[in-house]
Amino acid sequence: MTFNHPVKELIWVVQPRSYTDCKAAKKETRTSITTRLLPYVYDKPAVYEQWIQMNGQDRLERRYGDYFNKVQPYQHHTGFVPGVGVYMYSFAIKPEENQPSGTCNFSRVDTATIVMTMDGSVAVNQDTDDTWNVRVYAINYNVLRIMSGMGGLAYSN
């Protein structure tokens, strides 16, 4: 991940490639296409365990996929329940508030990685779903400083 600025929360989605490239839509009937759009099969998440590394060091120990899907949202959000296959990690105590309550300055992090072990029992069509797409989003801050009539960003590389 190559993010800059202080990040208060990471959100990522794991889906089989065929769920996102519309190839499945050509083969499915109208009633079964809605089930193909979900990022899991057999009501099980595809990720068995995952953890976050920064600059080669573990930021968190290995956690089951449900930790990032159920525990983190429960601890840091009000009334938000992500779907299966949507994961998050909050660096802030209260990420929903505008007032900062914790961040990780990704401007100072050279390498950040989410390491995942996929669940071998979750199988989709082996002919089309041989790879997985992972999309990572970051909610971040930056500060516009104005001094002596000149403006500039507080956090930059």
What is each PLM-predicted segment?
Residues M1-N157:
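Flexible assembly/topogenesis modules
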